[in-house]
Amino acid sequence: MKLFLSYILDENTPTYGDRDKLTITPKSQIIDGVGANTSTLNFSNNHMGTHMDTPYHFIENGKKTLDYKAEYFCFDHIYLIEKLIDTGDLITLSINEINSIPSDVEFLIIKTGYCKYRSLDKYHNDNPGLESSLAYDLRKKFPKLRAIGFDFISLTSWNHREHGRLSHRAFLGENDILVIEDMDLNNVYKEIKFDSLILAPLRTLDGNGGPVTIIADVNNKYKKQNEV
């Protein structure tokens, strides 16, 4: 069964600190007598919705989206950790949690349950973030790890913005771990086995990151609303 793990982009898409907006306006409409429906999409910031941060987002000479080959975005070893969080604090993983992760992991998913607040102000102005030290712990133990994703709006906690800059540089620095923010994890749980995952980024020339579509192939019998 295949599932979308990325949200639909619309004008209600939350943004970090509620500082940006996506607007979608019709450009031409068949109802007006023209030959096709077209729209204008205006992103006031490319980092909104389910999106990817590349090293160039925080590192001047860092890699950009186009520096990655297609196979880099295809993952066969995915692992999900459930760590329920209800406040905008910094997150790290215990020794036991880190030891539970398979040694060959390529894409690590952290489900906090914070996605339940996505329609509330709390989601964008009291969000958790990741401790910078976690990047070093993961990189040291899991040499095949290429991406980390989670169900809150940014790697940077709104309450710990200075530390968030350190965290971004820690994850996106040497031997970078791509950061996938604002994933739709409403319908995935630790019991689900991931067979594969495809990360499809919007490929732009000056790619410091941007919206992504994520499709996961899961070994599970039930069906949910985001099934492909």
Locate each region found by the language model:
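Active-/binding-site microenvironments in catalytic and ligand-binding cores
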Residues: M1-V228
